[in-house]
Amino acid sequence: MTSVMSHEFQLATAETWPNPWPMYRALRDHDPVHHVVPPQRPEYDYYVLSRHADVWSAARDHQTFSSAQGLTVNYGELEMIGLHDTPPMVMQDPPVHTEFRKLVSRGFTPRQVETVEPTVRKFVVERLEKLRANGGGDIVTELFKPLPSMVVAHYLGVPEEDWTQFDGWTQAIVAANAVDGATTGALDAVGSMMAYFTGLIERRRTEPADDAISHLVAAGVGADGDTAGTLSILAFTFTMVTGGNDTVTGMLGGSMPLLHRRPDQRRLLLDDPEGIPDAVEELLRLTSPVQGLARTTTRDVTIGDTTIPAGRRVLLLYGSANRDERQYGPDAAELDVTRCPRNILTFSHGAHHCLGAAAARMQCRVALTELLARCPDFEVAESRIVWSGGSYVRRPLSVPFRVTS
């Protein structure tokens, strides 16, 4: 008897993250503009877009699909996490978003990526050698989690001894966006984070360095009692800490079972390491760590046969769009390291395309290159992978990893 997957959408949990793909495919095939009406709170209804063409179009149309009310399906999100008066850059629309992004981008140049790459490689090699000497271990704890924290800290100019604070802040804020979110912990985390970075901003006024905060301070943001400017820098640090860590962890951690299951694909990369940059694009497509983010409609908009009213949340399901057979062919769900996929939505698209995409790609390329060179015959205990909670970012908390040669 063949089972039929329901095309009802459910926000993900740690229990469902291992395999959301059948639900996504059912949505794409049967209800690509899906309307979710919570039985207990029908006024909190929202829509889910699952096909690549629809998600791509919505992501680039910031005038219709606004980020200014928040990025989850929770109405009142900014109030929930204490950022109503100081929304971060990712929760702003052009032209406000555009002007600040221009200033911030000075700290995200190709030179910055090149500068940090040797440090990334050294860190990756040290951690992999430790894992290899021990015959394996939890590769997320040892490598994939601390790696992006180190890079985010580099971009923000945070001293090494303070890096570990990032994880606690991120976990508390992500928890607040669960259905029954722990908002008190999130508010405490935001308060602690803002206090820390307020001190760092003041320090950079007298001790400038080559980092994003220093560039903003040097541009005069927050100078001479400009409280709004200082708050905008703080909101930017919020975006970096909460958004810059989990995506790289999700991609690298999510890639381990994919490569474990497909030794033929791993062998292609071992035989031709020059193909690793293209493989990174394919792994970014399939893992899609940020599985979806929401927008709010500014007007009535019709997609297919469905009209979405103004003022409704719309979840752009990047993880589904990246596996859409209409875009990537009938084998879209399969790993093909030679695919060279175009127009992936892993870093979104349009005005809100991820500012740190180049740095994320570099980390993934370096980590994958060194992993395959030093541990070519690794194994992963898939049944023991533990996934993080939260409904928007798919990342493992633990991936048991064994070196077999």
From Swiss-Prot:
Known cofactor(s): heme
Gene Ontology BP terms: cholesterol catabolic process
Keyword terms of this UniProt record: Heme, Iron, Metal-binding, Monooxygenase, Oxidoreductase
Species assigned in the record: Mycobacterium tuberculosis (strain ATCC 25618 / H37Rv)
Gene from which the chain derives: cyp130
Catalytic activity, EC: 1.14.-.-
Name recorded for this polypeptide: Cytochrome P450 130
Transmembrane segments: none
Binding of heme, residues: R101, G243, R295, Y318, S348, H352, C354
PROSITE patterns in the cross-refs: CYTOCHROME_P450
Activity regulation behaviour: Inhibited by azole drugs.
